Amino acid sequence: MKKIILSIALAMLTLTASAVPARRTQRTLTLSDGTQVTATLSGDENYHYWKTADGRAFVMNEENIPQEISLQQAQSKLQAKVQARNAHRIAKRTKHKAAWGAETNPISGERKGLVILVNYKDKKMQHTQAEYNDYFNKAGYSENNCTGSVRDYFLSQSYGKFSLDFDVMGPVTLSKNLSYYGDNDSDGNDKHAAEMVAEAVKLAVSGIDLKKYDWDGDGYVDQVYVVYAGYGEHADAPANTIWPHEFELSEAAKYNDGPGALTINGVTIDTYACSSELRGSSGNKMDGIGTACHEFSHCLAIPDMYDTSADGENFGMNVWDLMDYGSYNGEDGYGETPAPFTSYERMYCGWLTPVELTQPCNVNDMPAITKEPVAYLIRNANPKFPGEYYLLENHQQESWDAYAPAHGMLILHVDFNSNAWKQNTVNNVASHQRMTIIPADGKLSHYNTAGDTWPGTSKKTALTDSSNPAAKLYNLNSNGRK
């Protein structure tokens, strides 16, 4: 179905009328007593653990042996670490990038990104600078089953309005072995990842004009991106590999990791992101582009749309958004064809102006979101809550949506809150997810996404206050109802 027809009774008028998350990898853990359990990786770079179906939790200790802790303890540690780090990061982000927590952040034209390739003393990259220059910049890049390069991705999402070009440096060779930088502490977190980044920066950027990587003239490089040799811990690689993440050198130093922010030739490097050269835990295939696209989207002040809380179970945007699990979409499930930006993110960046609907109507012949800047918006008619609205967008299984689980209309429910966006907690409250979907089949499930679109497998063609699922609000509408 290339063109969709959906009758929308505009319920919102009177109620009649958004680091990458852990790849959902399973592993058989051998415990100290020799017994084995099957567990799924949970959490993110802040704190991660292995969770079994019956609710047991394990972390890999410094000897790479599974150590059982209570699930509550694991979640409490993650929550405490996130809160402590967020308190510092929020202040830093809002000081140096006012767009964090803003309703819009229009961006267009050309920007430059800095990428550094890294060898460890005992582990060298299997792919060359030329290959990575193609990976980040080449038009129509198709190696390793990718749908395009990182530059292609942003050009496409912006409908040609925003070009992100990359300077790829290196590889540089670090002074220590892989196991030093990726060694885990007792909580399973990398001890020296920021030290790796700082050392790489010092080796790579001597004599370079860093001002071209400062997008807003605040004296800070918006992000330096490091690709390190070998595998990443997020995809079931050994515990002494590094978990891809975004962080600040200044914040890492507070955890005794690295020297802090670096000021070179009058420009400061603080925010960094990093990811692995290779996908999975075996073979020599380059990782997909999804993680790089996700991390550079943070430079646009776009928050994570997955549940960043300790539990991490909320649906969020799941496979439908680059800023959630969609960063892994692709033929092999490693981000070769990451999910496209939603209409919300395109609207936020100034690349799409939705058509606002104010009367009940039929929505016909909507072009795919990957092809044309078309979406429809239905706002809560209560003027006290202008940040709550529905967005309607058409997804077809082609282009960046080629690996979407279904085709048809996707209905997003947005309830913008500046603090939630600023604190990177958009979808952390199960009963009030602020950037999620209304699935046609009524099932918000990580493992049942084929029925999310309209009409979809459930053949639903109407969304009203009495339909199933029903059009609901978080805030009172103009009639005093939700």
What are these regions, as identified by a protein language model?
Residues L10-S18:
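Hydrophobic h-region of N-terminal signal peptides that target proteins for export
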Residues W100-I107, G148-N265, A375:
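Active-site-proximal segments of metallohydrolase catalytic domains
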Residues R151-Y153, Q223-A404, D415-N417:
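Extracellular hydrolytic enzyme modules, especially secreted metalloproteases
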